[in-house]
Amino acid sequence: MNPVEKLALLRVEMKKRHLDAYVVVTDDFHASEYVGAHFKAREFLSGFTGSAGTLVVLPDAAALWTDGRYFLQASQQLEGSGIELMRMGQPGVPEIPAFLRDHVPENGWIGFDSRTISNDFARSIGEKTREKRIRFAGDEDLVDLVWTDRPALSCEPLWELDVQYAGLTRREKLAMVRGKMKEMGASVFVIPSLDEVAWLLNLRGNDVLFTPVFLSYLLLEQDTATLCVQREAVSAEIEAHLKSDGVTLAPYDDIYRLVAALPTGTRVLLDGERANYRILQSVPESAEVLDRTSPIQLMKAVKTPAEQENERLAHIKDGVAVTRFIYWLKHTIGKEPITELSASKKLESLRAEGEHYLEQSFDPILAYGAHGAIVHYEPTEETDIPMEPRGLCLADTGAQYLEGTTDITRTIALGPLTDEEKRIYTLVLRGHIQLGAAKFLHGCMGENLDMLARTPLWEAGLDFNHGTGHGVGFVLGVHEGPERVHWDVKRQKRHCVIEEGMIFSNEPGIYLAGKFGVRIENLVVVREAEVNEYGRFLALEPLTLVPYDRDAIDLSLLSSRDVELLNAYHAKVFAAISPYLSGDELEWLKEATEPVQFC
């Protein structure tokens, strides 16, 4: 079936239930960024494969909202579907709640699966549509009636992350969170986020592609903890370990029953941005809801010394693999056929040679030429193209190791470049290395740092429509909060001070539609630089250790400071990576990291 046929079947079900609109989001029951195959309802209906987007289906129309990363991709994939593309943040584009207010009649009904809609999103719709007395119907997943061959819920075995990697035991983490609960006046903490449950319990799984988590909820009290999980995924050994730390098991779907049974006067802590609407609706009226940012977010974001050291080890392994890949690509292009997909598979195979490699950390982006202008392009059998010994290849990839999570982008010259390609590459590189060299007082937030990366681009009248940096989990999600580097404070729902031990990305880019794209990305860890009478200064240490492409740099555009920073980084790369290379690969790395001279 194509999207037109699928939407027609969905509208039949909507009509049976007298629904005036049906909302289909990208999320699973846990507001995860990446979701298992079972939860890809929006993709199934619309054909749009991006990782962010919301579909609204009306009786005679449909619209899909997505952000700037996916404007080009969505416009291509939605063609002929009858679904209007809503470019979020652009002039004249309504937000979803306002759209629903304007298109649903008075006393009408909006349907959705309330397990996939966040409490915050449902509340925003309710506030916007209240005057028209529009009601919600959230008990049914109508997509399930249309998607006849829908994949089952994943149920992969859990595994324990040893304290040598985590740095804190399960008991220590539980005590930390219970301490925060006391501070916040909460008697119960409902934890629906898969990464938070995994972090807190030092457990990992394989229920979500690219993210080693497992389908679960945790109900935490001062003296008890109940893990709602698919029982067949938990070995007897892990169950015994959990029990010894005061954690008991319950069926996965029991979370709603357990919340509904909370006694009168219970003060329930939950994060409305992460808790689904059905959880909130299950809370008894006699209980008090404390809608707060989850305290686990910040705990998880500030990496332990053990996590930081393990991440350094992971990035050396990753740096070796990516460096070998760049060498292979530059020396093979034009001699053997190489496509975007075959290059992607080559890089994955090189990473898999590393000890303790688990999986990729997201869908790899190998984008040649004009495909590089599609910010989150992912090559498929339908879109794959051959690469030629000229122009640029944008490679944004990452991996999961026992020692940590990686995310790196390198834009690679495959042969001769135009002056425009070199100019854009060099401007992006300047912003990237200037942010990487930041030294700042504690108390700064991501929006304070963002302009360091954008200034060389803004001075040239250029910009990019995505964040400059995102937090990264430890053997968890490649994107996490609460830290974020973005200049536009209007887009920031929650603001976060940059703390020592945080790990986030530094990834400016420029994308020229129909031509090419350039993005350069390192992960950095925040460390203390100095403390003096002015305060506590922090700095950024690069974790990613892979050479930039000297073949793409216009040296005349670099300042003396830029040259100094570039050479210092390349010296660090050579020192870390060279012991693991030999022969021609080592000789190439020497050349790739040779100091450049200021023009």
What are these regions (language model features)?
Residues M1-C599:
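Active-site neighborhoods and metal-handling regions in enzymes and metal-associated proteins
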